[in-house]
A protein has these predicted regions:
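A charged, aromatic-enriched C-terminal amphipathic alpha-helix characteristic of glycosyltransferases
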Residues: 353-381
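Carbohydrate-associated surface elements
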Residues: 165, 184
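Nucleotide-activated donor-binding/catalytic signature segment of Leloir-type glycosyltransferases, i.e.
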Residues: 255-273, 277
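Conserved acidic donor-binding segment of nucleotide-sugar-dependent glycosyltransferases
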Residues: 326-338, 345-351
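N-terminal subdomain of nucleotide-sugar transferases
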Residues: 1-51, 56-57, 370, 374, ...
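Short alpha-helical donor nucleotide-sugar binding micro-motif in glycosyltransferases
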Residues: 153, 281-286
């Protein structure tokens, strides 16, 4: 069979969706006889071919100089690629114009199309508008967004979600045929070995007793990074020599991070880390991975951190419970800097190596990419068979 992934959430500086599709390509090439086609935005229009894989880059305008994300607006080019390739199944990882084009092309070419609900964007963007628009206007906007989500995702043959809890929310909104798919992790790259923590900490010039906190991801409102920066400032007020924050990522809230660096010397910022092996080194060196987001649905970085033996702390109420492989006793009860700062202090008093070791073992047992993709491709087969029966 030939499978096609179509998304505009794709940056050369990495990101969860990019890692997901490239791990899928690697699995197809090493474990199956299938073909794969990936259609994404890029700085120029070109096709990169490797064995049974083709990546189509469509020239698209840059919308973020920090993260290098682009808006895929040339919908005719998408249509032409799909007409030429004629895949057996299309997966859309986008809730906007690209998704509607995937659905329309699928109907025209008689190809089943599934949607992957990577980000719970109504909560991330619309809920926050309530405080500016007022309760009545905000709720009206939320109702409109629910209808949009329902109409879009009911146009797919199936909607894939990385969390059963999130799937329940979509079902309550009227989205049908929701299928839960686990996230995976490359346990060869992201593992507790080798023991290079001392070398990495020396590179960062950290005193032996200082706790290293790590954040990996975009610096953006929907990631709640401003709250993380405020929480770290409070930590250093109470204990200026006890913690160090390493941030790997860039985005619209970089100015808040620069302000934090100006006030707190114990902050290191790396705008990007494109090498997975280097990223794994930083995961291993950290005492604790801090995940401040409350609307995260994908959360691959949290899974990678645990696979490397580093536990995760965050704020209760997110959709990430399924991929947190150790207890969440220390997680923050409130979405405030004070609560997150207290949570980090409490978590650091626990036996973090023991928590991390358990999480790493479970990641290897349950969530290796081959195991995850076996389940995903079973869903693909089921969707394809049902689609043919309906025709």
């Amino acid at each position: 069979m030939k499978f096609c992934d179509l998304t505009q959430f794709y940056s050369p500086l990495s990101g969860g969706v990019k890692r997901y599709v490239h791990e899928k390509i690697a699995y197809i090439q090493s474990e199956t006889e299938h073909e794969h086609v990936l259609v994404v935005p890029g700085p120029k229009t070109e096709c990169v071919t490797s064995e049974r894989s083709r990546i189509y880059f469509i020239h698209s305008p840059l919308i973020s100089r920090a993260s290098h994300y682009r808006a895929l607006v040339n919908l005719r080019a998408i249509e032409q690629i799909l007409e030429r390739e004629k895949p057996d199944l299309i997966e859309s990882g986008d809730p906007y114009q690209v998704a509607w084009k995937a659905i329309a092309s699928g109907e025209a070419l008689r190809i089943p199309v599934v949607g992957f609900y990577h980000s719970h964007f109504p909560e991330a963007y619309v809920r926050s508008a309530v405080k500016f628009l007022g309760q009545t206007a905000g709720e009206a906007m939320m109702d409109f967004t629910r209808r949009y989500v329902r109409n879009l995702y009911n146009s797919f043959q199936a909607t894939l979600v990385p969390s059963a809890r999130l799937g329940s929310v979509l079902s309550e909104w009227g989205v049908e045929n929701v299928r839960t798919v686990n996230l995976g992790v490359n346990t060869t790259v992201f593992s507790p070995s080798p023991d290079d923590t001392g070398e990495t900490r020396a590179e960062l010039e950290l005193p032996t007793a200082r706790r290293l906190l790590l954040y990996v991801g975009r610096l953006a409102k929907e990631k709640n990074t401003r709250l993380l920066f405020h929480a770290f400032a409070k930590l250093t007020e109470n204990a200026p020599d006890d913690f160090h924050l390493l941030v790997i990522g860039d985005g619209p809230e970089r100015s808040e991070l620069e302000d934090l660096q100006a006030r707190c010397p114990n902050v290191t910022w790396m705008r990007y880390c494109t090498d997975s092996s280097d990223l794994a080194r930083y995961y291993r060196a950290a005492d604790l991975f801090v995940h401040p987001g409350t609307q995260e649905t994908f959360g691959l970085v949290a899974l990678e951190s645990q696979a490397c033996g580093t536990p995760v702390v965050g704020i209760r109420g997110s959709y990430m419970d399924r991929i947190i492989l150790h207890d969440q006793e220390s997680w923050a009860e409130e979405d405030t800097p004070e609560s997150l700062a207290r949570t980090i202090e409490t978590a650091c008093s626990r036996n973090l190596p023991r928590l991390g070791a358990r999480a790493s073992r479970l990641a290897g047992e349950r969530l290796s990419w081959p195991r995850v993709f076996e389940c995903l491709f079973a869903i693909y087969q089921d969707v394809s068979l049902n689609y043919k029966k309906q025709r």
